């Protein structure tokens, strides 16, 4: 409402006028109103007022049910009945919001919305509440958590808001425009100009938007264009309030008089059918608020600020007998609202009290309200009391610190003796089956325990204490869960054992003796590691992705290219997919498909990993196609979900994976509809297994694949000819075959698993029958011999029985397009190639041979929750780059475990624990069809000046000078580097029984600031990069003491730093690495690990290792700077510019002391003196008040004199 022209003392609220009220001293406060209200020290009421026993509510007549204090002494500025729950929301002039539950007005929540401005409008949504202040729109949960905070322009003065639909909001005020805001993206989508400024009230019907102006006019606007259709000049002074119901519009306001503005007692009523005014309605109160209350009739409730309320019909006469008084505690009523059910009225006064009037003893605010979620009571667990009267009370209930001294309760040495544990009995089955030679027995190792590790458990103790154990000691009797001992060791889920040194003492070479790089598994959502490896070893995909670069912040193609580059550079060391998975978590489609797992679900294996990785496979191919498509078509840089997969010719990903099809729908009326489409992968469709299970019918894999590609099905579909849904025969025909055939196996139930198992048994019998006596019973080879057996040329090696078991999948398939749009698919063997000739010659006739390149497998293991691994056939180009040899070999990729395997192992699926999930077949000679050259897309322009994301950043706050064109770094140049980090997830650790701590999962760090300083030239030591990295993830610890990062520094809305994206800074560092600069810093190994960069060792000059002696502790940068440079750094917090500059100076000092590395013996003496001084000082730098720092000359002269 508008108070323009009124007495300023009544229209405005001055905080000084409303100090904290004392019920005894304030004459305006009704003592009976607050006699049961408990006030906290700040003067806020804590409980609602109970209804007096004498109050009697008459049905159909509004009477006061409850009064409650929202905030003592602070006027109520707005009230609103929640449209979804039984709640009443109240906002105050002090920016505080309070909610009350139910007609009893029990306090539900109370929180501060704005620290300086009053709350002007409240709107309830399904998931939260919208609060409008002067220039701020805040969306908060009903408990008080902020969902979003949208800052408007500082010059705006907003008064009204209108929710047009579930995701669109109109906001108006005293300016000459109305803003449209999209609540999904929290962005301004439209700004409508208003001819008459000052929109303080807005309403909506199914015909118009209604805008009430401070000039006294009401404008009716079109719902689509927002143009003025009609305008009512209601009052000559100002508009106070109006409401719309049906075809009537009623308004109250102020008229101009000789002495100023006066409240007009005539309500203006307009007929919206004829668009003209009808007879004004004279009332007996000074109207300030009005609302239609359409229950039985279209009644109007007219409220005055003094507390008088009158009901009347808008087309009749007002009756003075229909007036009742609200009895406000303060002198004025400030707000009024009606519930959606019309059973309750809410009034707020100038003293912070809220009055609830109802027409029934048990009213409801909404016709259909959902249940309200209440906070759980705070329960504090107390330690159980100890009863000292009990003689047998164990003293172990009292916690005592760990000590090595003798305790009073220790037994004397004379009364105790060591008793060795009895050896557990040998399993009876092992004793029965072992072979004896003399008195020595021999038995095969059942492989159920680790070497030299046997749990001590006696039989009698098992029955008494461990009867819940489900795993017996003997291998016999484990038929209930056979996979507990069937899973081969290399297929089990691998974990990293962390020590106090982190990953430095973990031997990754034990798990990977090749030069290929594995991927670390401890990152959230790292279940896709195996699929990343599959995509990497597709040579056209690897080259294409590494050539891609766009400006989108979270582009999966860009991040995957950066990760592929790291895998190229690595020489057997595992890599991390931090940045890729970070971008993956921001894609809305990934979350909608359920691909984002919680840490608890991923660790426990609650999700179906096979189904999950198949959905991820479909998602990543579609997303890469979109990312590449957006770069190649003219409309660049659209949103992540802005385009759908439509044509295979739009991107190279489409050319590789896309299969063009024709979908034919034939109705029984004879009409046929043909629609062209494309797909990036196929899903296996299995035949009805009910008969095959009994008869053992043989299905070739090629038959099942053809049935899945050329799918025929009967379904109900719309027929345009019949104009109704009819039974339709839908047929899918292939028009163009893909270069890479991707197949999701969809083995999601025991039915599909039994089908694979049955077909493997039938294939085994046929293979044994085919080869006859040529099959050897056992053929074992050393691991190094598999390279020679992988793909012998010109020689057919007869397989062994073990190699034929559980095999149904062919290594090659042959596909041919027929003239009648059909497809022929058959299994292809090496013998077929010798008979029909090479596949290359037949491609001219539309015949293609696909070779199996990868299989992704789900490992079932209840102990670890299962895992995903991949068998990948690594091509010649990869071996040439990594090992300098030219051959092909199958490998097992299990996170950071990489091991060469026989090719038959890649197609052997024991359905008890090894279930196929995804298959990749590639056309033979695929690499020759594509350009495999990689051109680095990162240019020197990434180092030039760029704008900051922070709104409040000013040029005076700039802490660095960007490089000029004549300063571009060259190969061998020095660059000082330092990075600061924040913590996203805390470390998970457990305390062992011996008191040592074991790290289960390390803390997840994220880079927050990266600084690079010039290492030579006239500007040496001046930073040219000092980027703060904006993050959208929740930070649990800013580590301010060690990083210097404060809350708000990484928020683009309030930060004053030079804020940029991680991708932007990553590109700068990648360019410096690619050009060959040398980085100087302290502890760079951790910095590059968190940033997710792989840097060649000859480009890293780490002072933590330059000033280090073997088998000695690492020395901090602070101590080195004090000892060698007489500098005291890192006083209160760390500063990355200071640390990078100090590391450069230390490197110069290292060159000076070691004579550029030519005198290692003299430098060794310096290091000995450093360590001796450090031990004496306990490695602590003296405080300024204490002893002075030793001067360089004195320190080194004493060292050199040794």
Swiss-Prot record:
Residues 368-485 are annotated as: Linker. GO terms for molecular function: 3'-5'-RNA exonuclease activity; metal ion binding; nucleic acid binding; poly(A)-specific ribonuclease activity. Belongs to the peptidase C19 family. PAN2 subfamily. Binds 2 metal cations per subunit in the catalytic exonuclease domain. It comes from Homo sapiens (Human). PROSITE patterns: USP_3. Positively regulated by the regulatory subunit PAN3. Keywords: Cytoplasm, Exonuclease, Hydrolase, Metal-binding, mRNA processing, Nuclease, Nucleus, Phosphoprotein, Repeat, WD repeat. GO terms for biological process: mRNA processing; nuclear-transcribed mRNA poly(A) tail shortening; positive regulation of cytoplasmic mRNA processing body assembly. It catalyses: Exonucleolytic cleavage of poly(A) to 5'-AMP. Its cofactor is a divalent metal cation. Catalytic subunit of the poly(A)-nuclease (PAN) deadenylation complex, one of two cytoplasmic mRNA deadenylases involved in general and miRNA-mediated mRNA turnover. PAN specifically shortens poly(A) tails of RNA and the activity is stimulated by poly(A)-binding protein (PABP). PAN deadenylation is followed by rapid degradation of the shortened mRNA tails by the CCR4-NOT complex. Its EC number is 3.1.13.4. It is found in: Cytoplasm; Cytoplasm, P-body; Nucleus. SUPFAM superfamilies: Cysteine proteinases, Ribonuclease H-like, WD40 repeat-like. Signal peptide: none annotated. This is PAN2-PAN3 deadenylation complex catalytic subunit PAN2. Forms a heterotrimer with an asymmetric homodimer of the regulatory subunit PAN3 to form the poly(A)-nuclease (PAN) deadenylation complex. Interacts with PAN3 isoform 1/Pan3L and isoform 3/Pan3S. Interacts with ZFP36. A divalent metal cation binds at residues 978, 980, 1087, 1139. WD repeats lie at residues 153-193, 195-231, 244-280, 328-367. The modification Phosphoserine is found at residues 791, 1189.
């Amino acid at each position: 409402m508008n108070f323009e022209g009124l007495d300023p003392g009544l229209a405005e609220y001055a905080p000084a006028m409303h100090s904290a009220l004392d019920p005894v001293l304030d004459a305006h406060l009704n003592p009976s109103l607050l006699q049961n209200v408990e006030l906290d020290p700040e003067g806020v009421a804590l409980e609602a007022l109970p209804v007096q026993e004498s109050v009697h509510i008459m049905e159909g007549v509004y009477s006061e049910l409850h009064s409650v204090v929202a905030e003592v002494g602070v006027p109520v500025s707005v009230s609103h009945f929640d449209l979804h729950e039984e709640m009443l929301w109240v906002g105050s002039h002090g920016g505080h919001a309070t909610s009350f539950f139910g007609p009893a007005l029990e306090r539900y929540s109370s929180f501060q919305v704005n620290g300086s401005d009053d709350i002007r409008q409240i709107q309830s949504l399904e998931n939260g509440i919208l609060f409008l202040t002067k220039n701020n729109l805040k969306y908060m949960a009903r408990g008080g958590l902020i969902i979003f905070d949208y800052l408007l322009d500082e010059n705006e003065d907003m008064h009204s808001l209108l929710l047009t639909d579930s995701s669109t909001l109109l906001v108006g005020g005293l300016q000459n425009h109305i803003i449209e805001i999209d609540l999904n993206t929290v962005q301004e989508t439209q700004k409508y100009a208003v001819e008459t400024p000052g929109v303080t009230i807005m309403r909506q019907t199914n015909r118009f938007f209604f805008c009430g102006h401070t000039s006294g006019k009401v404008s009716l606007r079109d719902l689509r264009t927002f143009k003025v259709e009609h305008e009512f000049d209601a009052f000559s002074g100002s508009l106070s309030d109006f409401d719309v119901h049906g075809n009537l519009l009623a308004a109250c306001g102020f008229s101009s008089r000789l002495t100023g503005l006066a409240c007009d007692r005539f309500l203006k009523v307009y007929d919206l059918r004829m668009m003209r005014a009808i007879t004004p309605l004279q009332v007996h109160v000074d109207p300030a608020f009005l609302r239609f209350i359409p229950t039985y009739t279209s009644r109007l409730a007219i409220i005055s600020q003094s507390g008088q309320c009158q009901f009347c019909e808008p087309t009749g006469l007002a009756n003075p007998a229909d007036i009742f008084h609200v009895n406000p505690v303060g002198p004025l009523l400030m707000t009024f609202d009606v519930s959606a059910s019309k059973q309750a009225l809410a009034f707020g006064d100038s003293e912070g009290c809220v009055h609830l009037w109802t027409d029934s003893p048990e009213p409801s605010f909404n016709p259909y309200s959902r249940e309200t979620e209440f906070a759980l009571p705070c329960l504090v667990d107390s330690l159980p009391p100890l009863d000292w009267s009990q003689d047998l009370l164990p003293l172990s209930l009292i916690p005592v610190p760990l000590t090595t001294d003798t305790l009073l309760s220790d037994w004397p040495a004379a009364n105790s003796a060591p008793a060795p544990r009895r050896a557990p009995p040998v399993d009876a089955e092992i004793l029965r089956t072992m072979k004896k030679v003399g008195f020595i027995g021999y038995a095969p190792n059942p492989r159920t325990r680790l070497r030299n590790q046997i749990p001590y458990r006696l039989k009698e103790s098992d029955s008494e204490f461990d009867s819940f154990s489900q795993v017996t000691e003997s291998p016999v009797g484990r038929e209930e869960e056979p996979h507990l001992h069937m899973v081969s060791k290399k297929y089990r889920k691998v974990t990293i054992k962390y020590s106090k040194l982190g990953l430095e003492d973990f031997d990754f070479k034990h798990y990977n003796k090749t030069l290929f790089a594995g991927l670390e598994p401890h990152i959230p959502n790292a279940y896709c590691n195996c699929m990343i490896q599959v995509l990497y070893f597709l040579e056209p995909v690897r080259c294409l992705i590494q050539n891609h670069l766009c400006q989108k912040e979270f582009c999966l193609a860009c991040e995957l290219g950066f990760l592929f580059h790291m895998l190229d550079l690595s020489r057997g060391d595992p890599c991390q997919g931090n940045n890729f998975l970070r971008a993956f978590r921001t894609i809305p489609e990934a979350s909608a498909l359920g691909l984002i797992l919680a840490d608890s679900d991923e660790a426990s294996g609650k999700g179906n990993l096979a189904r999950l990785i198949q959905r991820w496979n479909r998602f990543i191919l579609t997303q890469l196609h979109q990312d590449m498509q957006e770069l190649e078509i003219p409309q660049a840089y659209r949103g992540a979900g802005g385009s759908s997969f439509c044509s295979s010719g739009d991107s190279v990903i489409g050319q590789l994976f896309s299969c063009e099809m024709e979908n034919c729908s034939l109705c029984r009326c004879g009409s046929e509809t043909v629609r062209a489409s494309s797909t990036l992968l196929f899903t296996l469709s299995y035949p009805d297994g009910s008969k095959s299970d009994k008869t053992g019918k043989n299905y070739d894999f090629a038959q099942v694949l053809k049935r899945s590609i050329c799918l025929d099905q009967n379904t109900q579909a719309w027929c345009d000819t019949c104009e109704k849904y009819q039974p339709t025969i839908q047929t899918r025909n292939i028009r163009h075959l893909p270069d890479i055939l991707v197949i999701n196996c969809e083995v999601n139930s025991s039915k599909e698993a039994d089908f694979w198992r049955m077909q493997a048994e039938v294939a085994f019998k046929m293979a044994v029958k085919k080869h006859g006596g040529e099959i050897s019973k056992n053929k074992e080879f050393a691991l190094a011999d598999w390279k020679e057996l992988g793909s012998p040329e010109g020689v057919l090696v007869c397989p062994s029985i073990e190699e034929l078991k559980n095999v149904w999948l062919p290594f090659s398939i042959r596909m041919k397009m027929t003239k009648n749009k059909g497809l022929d698919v058959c299994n292809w063997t090496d013998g077929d190639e010798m008979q029909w000739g090479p596949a290359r010659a037949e491609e001219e006739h539309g015949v293609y041979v696909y070779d199996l390149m990868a299989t992704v497998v789900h490992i079932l293991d209840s102990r670890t929750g299962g895992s995903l691994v991949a068998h990948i056939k690594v091509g010649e180009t990869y071996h040439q780059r990594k090992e300098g040899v030219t051959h092909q070999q199958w490998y097992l990729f299990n996170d950071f475990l990489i091991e060469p395997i026989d090719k038959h192992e890649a197609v052997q699926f024991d359905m008890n624990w090894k279930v196929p999930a995804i298959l990749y077949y590639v056309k033979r000679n695929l690499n020759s069809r594509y350009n495999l050259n990689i051109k680095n897309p990162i240019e020197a322009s990434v180092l030039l000046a760029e704008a900051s994301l922070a709104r409040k950043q000013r040029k005076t706050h700039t802490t660095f000078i960007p490089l000029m064109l004549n300063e571009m770094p060259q190969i061998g140049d020095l660059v000082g580097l330092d990075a600061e980090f924040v913590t996203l997830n805390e470390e998970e650790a457990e305390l062992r029984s011996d008191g040592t701590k074991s790290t289960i999962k390390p803390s997840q760090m994220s880079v927050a600031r990266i600084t690079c300083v010039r290492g030579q030239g006239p500007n040496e030591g001046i930073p040219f990069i000092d980027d703060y990295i904006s993050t959208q993830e929740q930070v649990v610890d800013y580590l301010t003491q060690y990083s210097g990062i404060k809350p708000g520094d990484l928020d683009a809305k309030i930060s004053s730093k030079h804020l940029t994206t991680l991708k932007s800074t990553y590109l700068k560092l990648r360019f410096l690495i690619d050009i060959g600069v040398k980085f100087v810093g302290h502890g760079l190994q951790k910095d590059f690990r968190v940033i997710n960069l792989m840097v060649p060792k000859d480009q890293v000059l780490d002072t933590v290792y330059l000033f280090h002696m073997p088998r000695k502790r690492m020395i901090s940068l602070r101590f080195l700077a004090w000892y060698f440079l007489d500098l005291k750094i890192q006083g209160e917090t760390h500063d990355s510019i200071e640390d990078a500059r100090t590391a450069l100076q230390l490197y110069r000092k290292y060159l000076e002391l070691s004579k550029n590395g030519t005198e290692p013996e003299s430098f060794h003496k310096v290091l000995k003196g450093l360590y001796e001084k450090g031990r004496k000082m306990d490695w602590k730098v003296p405080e300024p008040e204490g002893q002075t720092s030793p001067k360089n000359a004195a320190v080194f002269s004493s060292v050199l004199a040794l």
